[in-house]
Amino acid sequence: MDGEDIPDFSSLKEETAYWKELSLKYKQSFQEARDELVEFQEGSRELEAELEAQLVQAEQRNRDLQADNQRLKYEVEALKEKLEHQYAQSYKQVSVLEDDLSQTRAIKEQLHKYVRELEQANDDLERAKRATIVSLEDFEQRLNQAIERNAFLESELDEKESLLVSVQRLKDEARDLRQELAVRERQQEVTRKSAPSSPTLDCEKMDSAVQASLSLPATPVGKGTENSFPSPKAIPNGFGTSPLTPSARISALNIVGDLLRKVGALESKLAACRNFAKDQASRKSYVPGSVNCGVMNSNGPECPRSGRATFFHKGAVNGFDPAPPPPGLGSSRPSSAPGMLPLSV
């Protein structure tokens, strides 16, 4: 009570609740202390009874021990007599054993000398063994290093061979792409020059040029994309087996992407030219009065242009306005024209 600080109360109800709670707390503490006192009294009575029983047992044990002590005193007297008799006999035996001990010590000294000689020989053998083990470990380490170096060189040789194969394949594919690109550029120039006069005839010439370009020696068409583009780690720089730097790899990928976009644009132009030729032929057969078409030679029909009869945008035919180029390598490109093999890039 004296050590506790009485808080300030704002109302009589709070003060009443505080003192009531405090009284209940002290009442509970009093009840617990009284219970502990009762338990302590019961335990002390039980302990007193137990101690009295132990005292009775200790007194009985003391009487038994006194009887045993008296009996043991008689036994000690008898053992003293036996000990004196044994001492006389043991003295005789000790004299005999001393003679034997002197002889045994002489033999022991001889054996100690022999053991020292054996230990020296053993030390020499252990030193030789340690030297042999060290030399064997050194030889084994050098042998393992040589094996690892040979394995590393073999892996480098295998990697170099695979890189040489990849370089040759990439060179072949680059040559094929350059040939196809040159053929399509010539094809585009011829089509652009002759489109206003005879688009159908130009398309047929373009088909023949593409077929001629396909007859050139190139890499097989059936190669998949997974064989055409090796991983960045496998692309050599053409002067050694060291991999490309990140900037060179990015520039190479940009060049390949530009080539793919150009090829897609050329294919879209070819498809537009073919569609234009087919539409002109269908319009000639179904709308004979709108366009005056006649057969000029055996290469194909020649249709004069008419401003009111065409259904195509002028720029899409003469300018070969291509479709938007693909955003990446994985995007879809317009399908090739009929009769043409798809490019393996």
Swiss-Prot record:
Return the annotated region ranges for Self-association. 56-166
Looking at the record, which segments are called Interaction with DISC1? 227-278
Region named Interaction with YWHAE: 189-256
**Modification Phosphoserine, positions:** 215, 231, 242, 344
Give the sites modified to Phosphothreonine: 219, 245
* Gene Ontology CC, one term: axon hillock
Where are the annotated segments for Required for interaction with PAFAH1B1?
114-133
Region annotated Required for localization to the centrosome and interaction with dynein, dynactin, tubulin gamma, PCM1 and PCNT, chain positions: 256-291
- Tell me the segments the record calls region Interaction with NEFL: 191-345
State the InterPro entries in the record: NUDE (IPR033494), NUDE_dom (IPR006964)
Picking any one GO biological process from the record gives:
insulin receptor signaling pathway
Origin superkingdom: Eukaryota
Which stretches are tagged as biased composition: Low complexity? 329-339
Q: Where is this region: Interaction with CENPF?
A: 175-345
Q: Which residues form a coiled coil?
A: 28-190
Describe the PTM. Answer: Phosphorylated in mitosis. Can be phosphorylated by CDK1, CDK5 and MAPK1. Phosphorylation by CDK5 promotes interaction with KATNA1 and YWHAE.
Task: Please give the sites of covalent lipid attachment annotated as S-palmitoyl cysteine.
Answer: 273
Enumerate the residue ranges of region (Interaction with KATNB1).
64-189
Keywords noted in UniProt: Centromere, Chromosome, Coiled coil, Cytoplasm, Cytoskeleton, Developmental protein, Differentiation, Kinetochore, Lipoprotein, Microtubule, Neurogenesis, Palmitate, Phosphoprotein, Transport
Subcellular localization is given as:
Cytoplasm, Cytoskeleton; Cytoplasm, Cytoskeleton, Microtubule organizing center, Centrosome; Chromosome, Centromere, Kinetochore; Cytoplasm, Cytoskeleton, Spindle
- Write one Pfam family the protein is assigned to: NUDE_C
What the record says about the induction of its expression is: Up-regulated during neurite outgrowth upon differentiation with NGF.
What the record says about family reads: Belongs to the nudE family.
Q: Please give the subunit comment from the record.
A: Self-associates. Interacts with dynactin, tubulin gamma, KATNA1, KATNB1, microtubules, PCM1, PCNT, and YWHAE. Interacts directly with NEFL and indirectly with NEFH. Interacts (via C-terminus) with CENPF. Interacts with DISC1, dynein and PAFAH1B1. Interacts with ZNF365. Interacts with PLEKHM1 (via N- and C-terminus). Interacts with GTP-bound RAB9A; the interaction may lead to RAB9A-dynein motor tethering.
Function comment: Required for organization of the cellular microtubule array and microtubule anchoring at the centrosome. May regulate microtubule organization at least in part by targeting the microtubule severing protein KATNA1 to the centrosome. Also positively regulates the activity of the minus-end directed microtubule motor protein dynein. May enhance dynein-mediated microtubule sliding by targeting dynein to the microtubule plus ends.
Name of the protein this chain belongs to: Nuclear distribution protein nudE-like 1
Q: Species name for this entry? A: Rattus norvegicus (Rat)
Name of the gene this protein is made from: Ndel1
